[in-house]
């Protein structure tokens, strides 16, 4: 993937850039793997906003991605197409299995049209192949990793994401996450070799607010510029938060929200580096 920069023909175009899509080989998705997707606009079943800054955007169709590839062990597949997916930052690859079935997977870096992909313990260690962690050599770069055996891929699924297999100890594997966190995962969990493609996605300059609106992202307004009726930080002459610590629009203290008693904390060997907020 490369990035194409626009000429500054308008203020919105100045500095903006877009992916060149050279790796995409087909513009229309596989009909049997497409489902309707209804935009929620950040609302729940009661119609109340539960996630702010969402709404609008272009209509999308959901592509069904295979995050559980257990049932295709020993069945080889050929990469028919690399496609664009509007619902994620990564590209997706359409696989044609030898038994006639078609499925989508996340497209790893350097996976090309016509390549062969395999699943199971007998698969080679090359990008796109899916194996259990116990069958992957230490030091290998992997992505789309399960948290629990058979639970489907949960980690490292966005563009450019990758995890390194550091060690194996007993029944657990030590993984270095994209955040720098080192975590224990059961060796029976599956992972895909390689890193997710489209790594240049993070370098795209959107250029104007309208391009974010096309993606369904609404403006983020700071509480300090609101009125007192709208936010605890609102009001006052000039920029002032009233001398209180940062809070949400509902008055709840801002900061870290993870519970110190969470059961899965015992699987974290080393935490990611963060700028701690008091």
From Swiss-Prot:
PROSITE patterns: RIBOSOMAL_L2. The keyword Ribonucleoprotein applies. Keywords: Ribonucleoprotein, Ribosomal protein, RNA-binding, rRNA-binding. It comes from the Bacteria. GO terms for molecular function: RNA binding; rRNA binding; structural constituent of ribosome; transferase activity. Disulfide bonds: none annotated. Gene3D superfamilies: 2.30.30.30, Nucleic acid-binding proteins, Ribosomal protein L2, domain 3. Coiled coil: none annotated. Residues 26-57, 225-278 are annotated as: Disordered. GO terms for biological process: cytoplasmic translation; translation. Residues 258-278 have a biased composition (Basic residues). GO terms for cellular component: large ribosomal subunit. HAMAP family: Ribosomal_uL2_B (MF_01320_B). Part of the 50S ribosomal subunit. Forms a bridge to the 30S subunit in the 70S ribosome. One of the primary rRNA binding proteins. Required for association of the 30S and 50S subunits to form the 70S ribosome, for tRNA binding and peptide bond formation. It has been suggested to have peptidyltransferase activity; this is somewhat controversial. Makes several contacts with the 16S rRNA in the 70S ribosome. NCBIfam families: rplB_bact. Belongs to the universal ribosomal protein uL2 family. This is Large ribosomal subunit protein uL2. It comes from Streptomyces coelicolor (strain ATCC BAA-471 / A3(2) / M145). The lineage of its organism: Bacteria, Bacillati, Actinomycetota, Actinomycetes, Kitasatosporales.
């Amino acid at each position: 993937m490369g990035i194409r920069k626009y000429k500054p023909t308008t203020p919105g175009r100045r500095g903006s850039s877009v992916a060149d899509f050279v790796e995409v080989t087909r513009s229309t998705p596989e009909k049997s793997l497409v489902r309707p997707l209804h935009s929620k606009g950040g609302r729940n079943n009661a119609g109340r906003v539960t996630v702010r800054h969402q709404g609008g955007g272009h209509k999308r169709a959901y592509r069904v991605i295979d995050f559980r590839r257990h049932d295709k062990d020993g069945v080889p597949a050929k990469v028919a197409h690399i496609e664009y997916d509007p619902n994620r930052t990564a590209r997706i690859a359409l696989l044609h299995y030898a038994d006639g079935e078609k499925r989508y997977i996340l497209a790893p870096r350097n996976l090309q049209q016509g390549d062969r992909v395999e699943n199971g313990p007998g698969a080679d260690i090359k990008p796109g192949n899916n194996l259990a962690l116990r069958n992957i050599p230490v030091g290998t770069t992997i992505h789309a990793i399960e948290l629990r055996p058979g639970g489907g891929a949960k980690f490292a699924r966005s563009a450019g994401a990758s995890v390194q297999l550091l060690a194996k100890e007993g029944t657990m594997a030590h993984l270095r996450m994209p955040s720098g966190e080192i975590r224990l995962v059961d060796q029976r969990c599956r992972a895909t070799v390689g890193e997710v493609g489209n790594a240049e996605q993070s370098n795209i300059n959107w250029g104007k607010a309208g391009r974010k609106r096309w993606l369904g992202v609404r403006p983020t307004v700071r509480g300090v510029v609101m009125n007192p009726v709208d936010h605890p930080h609102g009001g006052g002459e000039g920029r002032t938060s009233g001398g209180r610590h940062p809070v949400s629009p509902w008055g709840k203290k801002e900061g870290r929200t993870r519970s110190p008693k969470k059961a899965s904390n015992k699987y974290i060997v080393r935490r990611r580096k963060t700028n701690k907020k008091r």
